[in-house]
Amino acid sequence: MSDINAVKHFLLSLQKDICQQLAAIDGGADFAEDEWQRAEGGGGCSRVLSGGRIFERTGVNFSHVTGKSLPPSASTHRPDLAGRSFQAMGVSLVIHPLSPYIPTSHANVRLFVAEKPGEEPVWWFGGGFDLTPYYGFKEDAVHWHQTAHDLCQPFGDDVYPRYKKWCDDYFFLKHRNEARGIGGLFFDDLNEPDFATSFAFIRAVGNGFLDGYLPIVERRKDLAWGERERDFQLYRRGRYVEFNLIWDRGTLFGLQSGGRTESILMSMPPLARWEYQHQPEPDSPEAALYRDFLPARDWLAESNTHNKEA
């Protein structure tokens, strides 16, 4: 498939662009680059910024790996593809800010190709982005979802609501009965209507991520915070760790396929904490996160209703 080279070129360019923009807004640290090879086939480049002025740790990873047999995490929903050789390439990033008022965020765009001698390759795209605030602001939630909606709109009226719901359902800690954050977009197994359109969509998602995230960083980066806010941020980061290690398909795929553990676990926060039976104080900003932000909401419909009433 000659189209694979175009996807790879886009992904490498996306990684470079995102790193440049994040380093520029941080202003206190730069990305360290770590190129690596995988014994089973392929390799990648991990870029990590640590100890920044704004970002405590940010990892932006590119990988292009090959293998002789799809691991279970990639073929669970497509049992007909079990045993096929595969290529997988993508950019995955996680941003853990220092300030508790700036949300953690994650984004990913990827391409899978499953191959079998004598048959046409089976390909599909996946990805999305999501936001995990510690202290919620409605203005930020509406902006985040408006950005997601607008980039989806050229591809059909049903795309945003479908992928928003998928995101709400996917980034949910079943063992806690609790959402990880306020969602965004999530999609997988995308191969319709054709390769060109599917590729155009992941370009829109990848290029649109910082349009959603950086304005939130700018709004919140200078807010004062102290030990209370930091403790709550670290406690909520524990939920992030739980999701990634228990439920995340990307983490499971990486580990099951013999991926590079350092790069796979790059998504982990540098610090997190757990408390036994933690309960936020009633009517506190911490309680508002659970009450007003973690339950799935139609942020855009609520915003439009409010604007009409105003």
Swiss-Prot record:
- What cofactor does this chain's UniProt record say it requires? a divalent metal cation
Q: Which Pfam families match?
A: Coprogen_oxidas (PF01218)
Q: Give a yes or no for keyword Metal-binding in this entry.
A: yes
Compartment(s) where it occurs, according to its Swiss-Prot or TrEMBL record: Cytoplasm
Q: In which pathway does it act?
A: Porphyrin-containing compound metabolism; protoporphyrin-IX biosynthesis; protoporphyrinogen-IX from coproporphyrinogen-III (O2 route): step 1/1
Supply the alphabetized keyword list. Answer: Cytoplasm, Heme biosynthesis, Metal-binding, Oxidoreductase, Porphyrin biosynthesis
Gene Ontology molecular function terms on file: coproporphyrinogen oxidase activity; metal ion binding; protein homodimerization activity
Q: Report residue spans for region: Important for dimerization.
A: 240-275
Q: What is its EC number?
A: 1.3.3.3
Gene3D superfamilies xref list: Coproporphyrinogen III oxidase, aerobic (3.40.1500.10)
Which EC main class describes this enzyme? oxidoreductase
Q: List residue numbers at the site (Important for dimerization).
A: H175
Any idea which positions bind substrate? S92, N108, V109, R110, G258, G259, R260
Q: Which reaction does it catalyse?
A: coproporphyrinogen III + O2 + 2 H(+) = protoporphyrinogen IX + 2 CO2 + 2 H2O
Q: Which GO terms describe its biological process?
A: protoporphyrinogen IX biosynthetic process
UniProt KW DNA repair keyword: no
Q: Which InterPro entries match?
A: Coprogen_oxidase_aer, Coprogen_oxidase_aer_sf, Coprogen_oxidase_CS
Main localization (coarse): cytoplasm
On assembly, the entry states:
Homodimer.
Against PANTHER family, the record matches this protein to: COPROPORPHYRINOGEN III OXIDASE, MITOCHONDRIAL, OXYGEN-DEPENDENT COPROPORPHYRINOGEN-III OXIDASE, MITOCHONDRIAL
The task this protein performs is described as: Involved in the heme biosynthesis. Catalyzes the aerobic oxidative decarboxylation of propionate groups of rings A and B of coproporphyrinogen-III to yield the vinyl groups in protoporphyrinogen-IX.
Give the protein name, as stated in the record: Oxygen-dependent coproporphyrinogen-III oxidase
What organism does the UniProt record list as the source? Pectobacterium atrosepticum (strain SCRI 1043 / ATCC BAA-672) (Erwinia carotovora subsp. atroseptica)
